[in-house]
């Protein structure tokens, strides 16, 4: 079969890293559509990159040696599981040999209330992840190689790989032992049924043979749960959409800051408008009360003022209010030394009441004489202050 035929469809890389980054890598290119191996090999990272040039892959399943990982089983009740997950390092502090600050803890599996926890040195995990990043292939998952073995109820799974025996126990934890002493390890604990995916050793009379395969092929075929990924917590992979946004991070930050400024300015502007509207509403009420002091309830000054104007136009009031207000405005404008302090309208008496301030008696008298051309003005009060004169005038319409 030609290479073009082999590489048609989707391919996935199954990669096993070594304990030492200087050691050779192992890989297998798996055809997802045909469920078969396209090529296998071992060597350096550079040699693998050369292979990937001929066999492009969509993703990689990465296995790391279980000899660098320890497994523990903890009881995590469902009611408080979220809180206990954060406390796992302290729960295992007495069982690990290193400082927990130097260790990474990842939950591999949950079975009822029991959790399988993998512990690995942070420095070792960072080295593996750096290799994956250098390779440049999207990583589907990073798991201890023993987790590629199927988990069976009341039975172990076993496979031989490079002078190591890998065991996955029915509890979910894993073990790795060299071929020359694995029997001694197993002799110290009761042994259930063992499903063996390698040729069964002659001494293992109770082991149950399974279809013989190799570790990388088994890892390609098995359904690896995403929960078994060692990349948890601070090492959790960045989601693709977040990765795509990283180049735009500074632009998005600047845009967010600008939007916040615009929003803040808009909120402040609307608040100022509200303050101004409230001020003028109160001012209109104040002016209306001065014009119509007999009215105790002012709900809508504008509507109430329009009602009064309509009554005036209809002849309800004998005092032509609008015309007289225009004349009063002209009088104030003609006498610059006189200022109007307050104005009120007594509807029952049909008269305007003014409170005036002038710089002298002469100016106040001049204003009064000019106003007499349009109004009846009974004697009013005037008093001299330190630097001005204050007066009260009542204006009534001419008969």
Swiss-Prot record:
Gene for this chain: outL
Cytoplasmic topology ranges: 1-247
Family: Belongs to the GSP L family.
Signal peptide: none
UniProt entry keywords in alphabetical sequence: Cell inner membrane, Cell membrane, Membrane, Protein transport, Transmembrane, Transmembrane helix, Transport
Transmembrane regions listed in the UniProt entry: 248-264
Protein name, entry field: Type II secretion system protein L
Topology of this chain in the membrane: Single-pass membrane protein
Pfam families per the UniProt record, alphabetical: GspL_C, T2SSL
Subunit annotation: Type II secretion system is composed of four main components: the outer membrane complex, the inner membrane complex, the cytoplasmic secretion ATPase and the periplasm-spanning pseudopilus. Forms homodimers. Interacts with OutM/GspM. Interacts with OutE/GspE and OutF/GspF.
